[in-house]
């Protein structure tokens, strides 16, 4: 009888090559099939090779929850009557109660979630279900913000770190800046003293690109500029923006394009023009090599009879179709979270919901690639505290 060859009979190199081409979400369901595959799917070289084999997914943080959107970006844009469908609220991060998630930050398939009052932090892989809980700094404040990044490693797991930052006025009415780093390998927080006297402010949600975080920042003397934090050197560096502005009321938002580029959306609130503009960078290998396109997209909101102030909090860009999917918080007779598609001659609202909670609960729309990346685990302490790290239900 002729023997049928199965994948386990193949040489390891060929087996690995075949599996690396399988969509990531399918592999996540197979990781417990056998010990060999379990080890392979945790190999950083295999994870890097497989990254990008699945379609991008959309996720919305709104009303203190995180929601999965059914379609990807192209599915929404190609629909004859586009609208967003939410399959489920991602409540699988709970331990004994539903968590109030106040902020999220995306970094290469991992989501950093901040809970109410920043009393707990959790890093979560929505593809594999793995989580790691992080104890906040002893200096933490309820208005802290956090970014997740890493130091790139070609041969081993990335060394992940968390940047904590906050700005506040002390008893002498002086502005104080605080920056701290949490290192996953040392499981500890430490202060970045060099930056406690900086006078610039951050004006948008940070965006992670290739392990580093980019912001739009500004100060009175120089106006707006782009700022990036290098998790390897643990230093901030200034980069140029494609426009000049000194008005802190302007809308300025960053987005990641295809995992290789940055885009910036700008709207001058004080000008007589009701125009939104978007620029895109070149492919970025090193931040110092960043350059901006002359111009990518300009949209005149007056054409669509829209209000002059649109509080865009996040956006996604489709370079091929030259359209943007914008998420904003619209304040008229009632406070609403909106998502709409906009282009030179296009405006289509695809989602609107009344916003709940405090004024700081800004919605955030993100696009992410499912990843098998493994979150560094804590040893050996966690073995005595199994409830601190657990697998949660995968997104299906």
Curated annotation (Swiss-Prot):
Residues spanning the signal sequence: none
Keyword line: Kelch repeat, Repeat
Kelch repeats: 163-209, 253-299, 338-386
Source species, domain of life: Eukaryota
InterPro entries per the UniProt record, alphabetical: F-box-assoc_dom_typ1, F-box-assoc_interact_dom, F-box-like_dom_sf, F-box_dom, Gal_Oxase/kelch_b-propeller, Kelch-typ_b-propeller, SCF_F-box_component
CDD domains: F-box_AtFBW1-like
PROSITE patterns reported in the protein's UniProt record: FBOX
Coiled-coil zones: none
Database matches in SUPFAM superfamilies: F-box domain, Galactose oxidase, central domain
Domain F-box: 4-50
This protein's name: Putative F-box/kelch-repeat protein At3g17540
